[in-house]
Amino acid sequence: MSNLSCFSIIGTHRSVFKFKGDLLVKENYTRFERARIVGARALQIAMGAPVLVEDDGRLDPLGVAIEELKAGVIPITVKRKKS
């Protein structure tokens, strides 16, 4: 298990910067969205999906998914209902 705690991703990283075309866009996720994104991506990595960040082999799939979220390279989008 990596030394990253659940709180380190759920509690502190509220904004993620992603490229949309040539623009750098700031995405704000709720803690529930972040948990779902990281969990889904960790499952994909555990099932053999390619890793999108530099991995030195020390991190487990959850740690890799957290690093991908911090880097803003996770290929998962969030669709919200319009209020």
UniProtKB/Swiss-Prot annotation:
Gene Ontology annotations for the cellular component aspect, listed alphabetically: cytoplasm; DNA-directed RNA polymerase complex
Compartment(s) where it occurs, according to its Swiss-Prot or TrEMBL record: Cytoplasm
E.C. code: 2.7.7.6
Pfam family for this entry, one: RNA_pol_Rpb6
Gene Ontology biological process terms, A to Z: transcription by RNA polymerase I; transcription by RNA polymerase II; tRNA transcription by RNA polymerase III
Alphabetized InterPro entries for the sequence: DNA-dir_RNA_polK_14-18kDa_CS, Pol_omega/Rpo6/RPB6, RPB6/omega-like_sf, Rpo6/Rpb6
Task of the protein: DNA-dependent RNA polymerase (RNAP) catalyzes the transcription of DNA into RNA using the four ribonucleoside triphosphates as substrates.
Subunit structure, as described in the record: Part of the RNA polymerase complex.
Protein name: DNA-directed RNA polymerase subunit Rpo6
Gene: rpo6
